[in-house]
């Protein structure tokens, strides 16, 4: 979806009648075939772009919910086609949200300032007093981590590797976060500076800060009830659930962490379980 238009006066009046407010209605752009019927009790501020709200979501138990915006506050947000965003306690700020994404009963989702979404975080592996830090990023491999941790007698190599990672992290830094297509975020708390890939499911997470959830259609990521994470990367096909607490961690592909597991300054590569 690339073409937008301003709201018509009739649409503005209809939105007002549906208890919507805006700091400036001129800052809102909508898809060419936008219909305001399914937008109610919503507050807009900053730059807003809205797609269409056609279609329904079929939830567990057969419950159906129509796409739309209900009881939410959006600030500097782009919403794709066919999304349902409902019952956001505080607000969503500085995000691009993809198509057919379902967000319900969350506290707050925001990006505050420029974020690198977990890229470039130094993880103190092997020696908890430091000296063998590994810089995590979306493309980290076990081989690269091994060299960074154990080849400290090659300082030129280590500095070059750090420079490459810093460059990647800076290139991916942004003041705008991303929530992909077909994402589900429900019954969750505080989500700040987190990039969320396609088809991810976040159900009941307590707090997620400064991280990347690198989910995709073929290998989705699940973040479950009570999870608390900060300074992290979660790779494709992994699940983190059942009250896991983790900080400064890289979680590789197809890993499973659960049962109140706790981790700090740790690297989990493919197929690990905790």
Write out the residue ranges for each language-model feature.
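Domain-scale signature associated with acetyltransferase and cell-envelope carbohydrate enzymes
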Residues: 1-274
